[in-house]
A protein has these predicted regions:
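C-terminal and inter-domain tail/linker signature
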Residues: 1-139
């Protein structure tokens, strides 16, 4: 697989929820996960699963559609449109926010850096936190 296909596989495994089983195969054991809006950093495939689970628990039908990929060296930046309904619970540092059924549609950017073995060594996600929280009805 080329790097854009590997980047697409990350989105595909999120969408079909197989990321829980495949994260260790797709990611380096020391992968760095960065949520830019919150400055949260985590390490390892298990942290990626926990991070992804947070969004799935809040928006169980959340799916991401890759709009565009740009490759530069061993990095792929993907522009993604996420859509779903806030029917679960979003856990934040300020406490839990219960779902209200609101539709959510947000564009976000994911930058993935790959090693020579095709494993993700760095996964950075960036999105408009204010818009996201507004759509949830939490802002």
């Amino acid at each position: 697989m080329d790097l854009e296909q590997l980047a697409q596989a990350t989105a595909d495994t999120f969408n079909d929820r197989s990321y829980r089983d495949k994260a260790k195969d797709m990611m380096d054991p020391d992968v760095l996960i960065v949520d830019k809006p919150t400055n949260q950093e985590m390490r390892g495939p298990d942290a990626y699963v926990q991070y992804s689970d947070g969004f799935v628990k809040a928006i169980p039908d959340l799916r991401g559609t890759v709009i565009e990929n740009k490759q530069s060296g061993n990095k792929v930046s993907s522009r993604v449109r996420g859509q779903g309904h806030f029917t679960g619970t979003m856990v934040t540092p300020q406490g839990s926010v219960p779902g209200n059924g609101n539709p959510v549609e947000i564009e976000y950017e994911i930058e993935q850096e790959f090693n020579d073995a095709g494993k993700v060594v760095r996964f950075v996600i960036d999105y408009d936190m204010q818009d996201f929280m507004r759509q949830l009805g939490a802002a």
